[in-house]
A protein has these predicted regions:
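Domain-level detector for secreted/extracellular nuclease and nuclease-toxin modules, and
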Residues: 1-332
Length: 332
């Protein structure tokens, strides 16, 4: 049985309104200079004695450590968590071909990150021998279950595609953990447009030395009357797995012989998409996707002119739907 979960959204991030996020400038933290500390003057003889003593000390005293503001949940001296830490809400998972963050409440990945090169895409592993499976690394009460997808009407959509993990059977099999899976509309999306986008990302390795891709679900609001509402289906019996309204792919590509980074951010609705729809129609500023997802992408890269350029300015952002010769099996 499917149920609908509704929330009143306080932030406008859905549909066309996601563009409104681009006008929201980030507030930089204000630095306040501390007042100078005045110390009484020392007599000259006392200063000379102190300098001589300091020169004789081979080791300096350790600096004063700042007060710890973020407490470890296992800290026995933390009175608020004396009898246990209720978190985390997410599990971090590191696999052969990807890293992932899994949301226990929504039973979906928060994000899945990959690094693609021409070399690591090579291999002969075949998905025909792989099976979807529940992830034992997630505590049992919070796992996505195989039965949740049974007759749900949705495909089990990969965030890290199986075709990106042909290195060996183990790598291929790891992409079938449900922690790498989200419910996706099958016809016209997972088996078509989304699959073509996955091929586009792989093909970038033909013109870039390194390609990094982060994929994940979004839950965006739509306007109803004068309110913005987040609505998404929940599948399973009892209801267990959230059905995202959208999916994002954030791509960073780099050439060894060129300075800087090319970055593209895309957000696609979880519904049938006409193949004639240009990929660029789903292109968004990186900051807009970050605000919608509550995530930071490639934050170690300085975002300024000359360092970061648009991916679609470096390469043609078009999909070749004919490149997906072999259709994904139904439900996958």
């Amino acid at each position: 049985m499917h149920r609908l979960v509704t929330f009143v959204a306080g932030t406008v991030v859905g549909g066309g309104a996601i563009y409104a996020l681009t006008s929201m400038t980030r507030q930089q933290p204000t630095t306040v200079a501390a007042p100078p500390i005045r110390t009484p003057a020392m007599p000259q003889q006392q200063q000379q004695q102190q300098q001589q003593q300091q020169q004789q000390l081979p080791i300096r005293a350790p600096p004063v450590q700042p007060r710890q503001l973020v407490l470890d949940g296992d800290n026995a001296n933390n009175e608020f968590l004396k009898y246990g830490n209720p978190g985390p809400v997410s599990d971090f998972l590191l696999r052969s071909r990807y890293a992932a963050s899994f949301n226990r409440a929504l039973r979906n990945p928060n994000w899945v990150a990959e690094h693609l090169t021409q070399d690591n895409l090579k291999g002969t592993a075949d998905r025909s021998s792989s099976e979807f499976k529940e992830d034992p690394l997630v505590p049992a009460p919070f796992r996505a279950l195989l039965k949740d997808y049974y007759r749900s009407g949705y495909d089990r959509g990969h965030m890290c595609p199986a075709a990106d993990a042909k290195k060996d059977a183990e790598s291929m099999n790891e992409t079938f953990f449900l922690t790498n899976i989200s419910p996706q509309v099958g016809k016209g999306f997972n088996r078509n447009y989304w699959a073509s986008l996955e091929t586009f990302v792989r093909d970038l390795t033909k013109s870039f030395d390194d390609v990094y891709c982060i994929s994940g679900p979004l839950y965006l609001p739509e306007k109803e009357g004068d309110k913005w509402m987040v609505k998404y289906e929940v599948i399973g019996s009892p209801p267990n797995v959230a059905v995202p309204t959208h999916f994002f792919k954030v791509i960073m590509a780099k050439r060894n012989n060129e300075p800087g980074f090319a970055i593209g951010a895309f957000a696609l609705p979880n519904k049938e998409i006409d193949n004639a729809t240009p990929l660029t129609s789903f292109s968004l500023p990186l900051e807009a996707v970050e605000k919608a997802a509550g995530l930071q992408f490639f934050d170690k890269i300085e975002r300024k002119t000359g360092v970061v350029t648009s991916l679609c300015a470096k390469t043609e952002c078009t999909l070749s739907h004919d490149s997906w010769k072999k259709k994904k099996p139904s439900g996958e």
